[in-house]
Amino acid sequence: VQGPGKVDVTLTVNGKQHKLSVEPRTTLLDALRDQLNLTGCKDDFDATSCSGSDTVIIDGKAVYASTRLAIEVQGQKIQTVESLRTGDQLDEVITGFVQNDAMQCGFCTPGFVMATRAFLNKKPKATLEEIQDGLGGNICRCGTYKGITACALQIAKGGA
């Protein structure tokens, strides 16, 4: 049992270890945004209908950061959208989103980028139907699904 009060945790985020002091109820999303200043994953402020805008990759799997406590993910490898840029180099999913006009307001974009990256890591030669099914846990209220699936399909067929 953890608490009451703050507890120390060590999180491995984007390849670096971070020692944090958090309340046991602190979600991974809150720890990332409030303590590590990694604001790419978004808080859609409605726990009853998560849009997936807070998607991160934990040990290779797309996960909503708002559904995990920071104390739960110690020892796991956490990857945020910020990890998909190294210097001037962008991950092909990010460049594919731009090339396929896969964003409008941009709120869902980081979550969709991470869900797409995780999905294509597991199924690099996916078909359109597999992509649509694989990204079904994320919601775009602007309706840019055509561009998002076009991006994933372009990568699956050989690159962005």
Residue ranges and their predicted role:
Residues 1-160:
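Signature of N-terminal electron-transfer/Fe-S-associated modules in redox systems
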